[in-house]
Amino acid sequence: MNTTTDRYLTRRGVKNLKKQVTKIDKELTKLENSLKTTEASKDSRFVIDNILSRIEQLKSEKREIKQVLANSKVLPRKRDRLYVALGSIVDLIDAKGRLMTLMIVDSIEANPSNGKISANSPLGESLIGKTIQETISLTIGCRKTELQLVAIR
């Protein structure tokens, strides 16, 4: 994981990462207790190895999340709504008149099924810096799509 660049996260994104750390801490505590009881009962070495492996995996995940949190900045609540930037919520209309609402986030928070797209994605890159009423042309594979930017929140 690249630790030298700052990431910009929403307040909710920071909160979710902190919840993940808490969840990992709870699971680590359970596994460490389980390891003690397993060692006391002299169960098979296979079970102990599995527990130790899981503990190492969780500690690694926790380190990565803490590193992301240490190198992250929270997006400001107020920003210029005249142009699309990281943290903007945008409304787009496609050629068929369908409305899409998307939030521009850092890649770590991206979840297209929940309407959060990465600023580094093709659509995210096309939107950054645009203003209301601009048309965004996007080519995916052989298909060219045009979207109208109708609102920035």
Region roles according to the model:
Residues 148-152:
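C-terminal tail/sorting-segment detector
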